[in-house]
A protein has these predicted regions:
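Interfacial "cap-and-anchor" motif at the non-cytosolic start of specific transmembrane alpha-helices
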Residues: 1-34
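Catalytic-core segments of nucleotide cyclases and related cyclic-nucleotide turnover enzymes
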Residues: 129-130, 228-232, 250, 265-305
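Active-site-proximal alpha-helical element of nucleotidyl cyclase-like catalytic domains
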Residues: 189-210, 218, 237, 242
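A short pre-motif secondary-structure segment
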Residues: 210-213, 254
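PAS-family sensory domains
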Residues: 111-121
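Active-site-proximal structural segments of metal-dependent nucleotidyl cyclase/transferase enzymes
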Residues: 151-185, 201, 212
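Conserved nucleotide-binding and Mg2+-coordinating catalytic segments in signaling enzymes
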Residues: 133-152, 173-187, 195
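Amphipathic HAMP/coiled-coil signal-transducing linker helices
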Residues: 28-30, 126-145, 159
Length: 305
């Protein structure tokens, strides 16, 4: 709201006094004390004036630079770009701040009288948005992607495969007999085990894949740029790592195993592939791994490893 009111006020004032008589406005304290940053630029990009809030953001805003083209002072500003809303990062030292800008065109007698940059520090707002976005896409218990989050990433990979030919693979993982952990030791133990599993998966993936909690004790792993054989190797490392893992819990030492189903995009040329199709294939491979004795890896269309 502040942006629109300020833009309206400034636009009316500048239209009233004309661009050449704008100093009549600047003599008033209100221009200087407004909390939003204000920077006035001529129609050909010459710095005319600014207020205190603008000067605290950009060190190059001082008297000796008035009359100079702003793109010489800071290449991020261009009145010819036609921008109306944009963000930039700035700050002093390691401190980085994010500013939201609005570029308002001011009317002169016969042509554009100039431009008014209005900007506001939105660092906290953007941090909150990022935090909310992270919370929406990540499981609150384990920190892995949520089901919706990991499927959104899968859609991106599938799009890259269809448009650019970038292969990827998908692993569906189920914790064997996980219910026994909850039944015998309680849900706190079960939650602890899930967190340890995610940590172990992440160490094996080492940034080369994405992990999501698909539901309960089921996980979905995406491995970009990996064909079936490489993905099966990753899956076996995941399985072996979990088999060797122990989790202290009170006076007890807990352990589990996992079953894994693996599928790769493009494994069956000529067939229409969607995320639902790939997940279904991985799930069928997982089902076969569980029916073959659990604690093993099955590749879709092949025998258990």
């Amino acid at each position: 709201v502040g942006y629109f009111v300020l833009a309206l006020f400034s636009g009316i004032g500048i239209f009233k006094y004309k661009i050449l008589e704008i100093n009549e406005i600047y003599d008033k304290d209100i221009f200087s004390e407004i909390k939003e940053g204000l920077m006035l630029v001529s129609h050909d990009g010459i710095l005319l004036d600014y207020n205190k809030s603008a000067q605290t953001v950009f060190g190059w805003l001082h008297e000796k630079n008035k009359g100079l083209p702003i793109h010489f002072l800071d290449s991020r500003f261009s009145v010819s770009a036609g921008a109306r809303n944009f963000y930039i990062n700035t700050g002093h030292g390691d401190e980085k701040r994010i500013y939201e800008f609005r570029l308002t065109e001011l009317e002169g007698k016969r042509k554009t009288g100039g431009y008014l940059y209005i900007f506001l520090d939105v660092t906290e707002k953007m941090c909150l948005i990022d935090k909310l976005r992270y919370m929406a896409d990540h499981d609150s218990l384990t920190g892995a992607f949520t089901r919706g989050g990991i499927l959104a990433e899968a859609k991106k990979l599938l799009s890259a495969y269809k448009n650019k030919g970038r292969i990827f693979s998908l692993c569906m993982i189920d914790v064997d007999y996980f219910k026994e952990i909850n039944d015998n030791y309680g849900h706190i133990a079960g939650n602890r085990m899930l967190c340890e599993l995610v940590e172990a998966f992440s160490q094996v993936l080492d940034g080369k894949g994405m992990l999501g909690r698909y539901g309960g004790e089921e996980f979905l792993v995406l491995i970009p740029d990996a064909a079936m054989e490489e993905a099966a190797g990753f899956a076996e490392k995941l399985r072996a790592g979990i088999e060797a893992m122990t989790v202290p819990f009170g006076e007890n030492t807990l352990s589990v195993t996992v079953s894994v189903g693996v599928v790769s995009a493009g494994s069956y040329p000529g067939e229409e592939e969607t995320i639902d199709v790939l997940v279904s294939r991985a799930d069928r491979a997982l089902y076969r791994a569980k029916n073959s004795g659990r604690n093993r890896v099955c590749v879709f269309g092949e025998d258990a490893l």
